[in-house]
């Protein structure tokens, strides 16, 4: 995958962090949220954090160039269209994650990685009943991921080895060190 496309579901603090990671690495990112006000706040926060990173000489590109790689949308289907990797960053709500991963499975090709940033819920809890769940896993980042460039990669028993390897390669490509956890906590 020479030019992967990234999607982020949820525009809160973790979504902001992932967007900066992917865009800073030179890739286009689409960010979805259900509220327009949340997306406007997201854009302000990304701009502010990029400027702070730039002031501390932690960027290779200008904040403006990096921010230009990030697009926001209120349309979930538009957000994941053409994506190779989807990073879910929603609230720690089991029913919400189940519903969201079911939708994501229906909107994406079966080889698209569907990752959750969850720190409390297991992949087996929210993805066990969905189609093509072999591509689902938890990818829990250091916070903020643009400064603490490590992420736990936690597959479920049903997650394929191929999906885990593709995920780890994509993380390395964007400057994140993947630490694989072999058993869900």
Which functions belong to the PLM regions below?
Residues 1-52:
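NAD(P)+-binding Rossmann beta1-loop-alpha1 motif at the extreme N-terminus of oxidoreductases
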Residues 6, 31, 66-85, 166-176, ...:
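Amphipathic alpha-helical segments at domain termini/boundaries
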Residues 19-21, 43-44, 98-101, 126-128:
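Short amphipathic alpha-helical segments
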Residues 22, 47-54, 87, 108, ...:
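Structural signal for hydrophobic packing residues in well-ordered secondary-structure cores
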Residues 31-64, 153-163, 178, 185:
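Rossmann-like dinucleotide-binding cores of NAD(P)H-dependent redox enzymes
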Residues 37-41, 52-114, 121-122:
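Rossmann-like NAD(P)-binding element
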Residues 113-184:
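Rossmann-fold dinucleotide-binding core
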């Amino acid at each position: 995958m020479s030019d992967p496309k990234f999607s982020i579901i949820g525009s809160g603090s973790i979504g902001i962090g992932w967007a900066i990671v992917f865009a800073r690495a030179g890739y286009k990112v689409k960010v979805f949220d259900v509220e327009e006000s949340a997306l406007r706040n997201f854009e302000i926060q990304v701009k502010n954090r990029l400027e702070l990173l730039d002031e501390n000489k932690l960027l290779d590109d200008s904040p403006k160039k990096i921010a230009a790689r990030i697009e926001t949308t209120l349309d979930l289907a538009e957000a994941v269209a053409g994506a190779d990797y989807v990073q879910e960053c929603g609230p720690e709500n089991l029913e919400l994650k189940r519903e969201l991963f079911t939708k994501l499975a229906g909107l994406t090709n079966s080889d698209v990685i569907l990752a959750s940033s969850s720190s409390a819920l297991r992949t087996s809890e929210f993805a066990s009943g969905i189609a093509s769940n072999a591509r689902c896993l938890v990818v829990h980042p250091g916070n903020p991921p643009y400064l603490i460039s490590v992420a736990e990669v936690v597959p479920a028993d049903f997650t394929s080895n191929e999906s885990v390897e593709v995920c780890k390669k994509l993380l390395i490509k964007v400057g994140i060190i993947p630490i694989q956890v072999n058993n869900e906590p």
